[in-house]
Amino acid sequence: MMERYLDPSLTPDERAEDLADRLTVEEQASQLRYDALPIPRLGIPAYNWWNEGLHGVARAGTATMFPQAIGMAATFDTALLHQIGEITATEARAKHMAAREHGDFDIYKGLTLWAPNINLFRDPRWGRGHETYGEDPFLTARLGVAFVKGMQGEGKVLKAAACGLGFAFLNYMDGELTPG
């Protein structure tokens, strides 16, 4: 009989609850790092969550590079951002699978991508403004949703998992918050 956490007919919540019940406290803690350790007794391989995709798959060899987010925002084109999210996810998945075949679970090989940056760029002194869609909350929301939907896909299984950057605290630099 298949373990409940492996049963694709169950909801993600049901599967996660079953898996969490099987893990020791130490095993649960080992999964909180970006470089999650394997849990051989449950068939869980090592996994590295650290990957970036703000404007294409970053630092993982050859990949399509798109303009910085602030430049993409200037298009006001949600369909374009959706397509860029799709392409980024497709390339990330291909790189993930190729690395996995070679037992490579290092940084920049996972399917959780730190993107998009949904912080609002309200202070020009902030050094990461180019990673955002600008200062307008409406535009940032529309473009962010389009990018995430493109990246994650419409299927039962996510193509890649978008992890929105910032939102509240990415403007924390050098020990203090920059106004913004």
Task: Name these PLM-found stretches.
Residues M1-G180:
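Glycoside hydrolase catalytic-domain context in secreted enzymes
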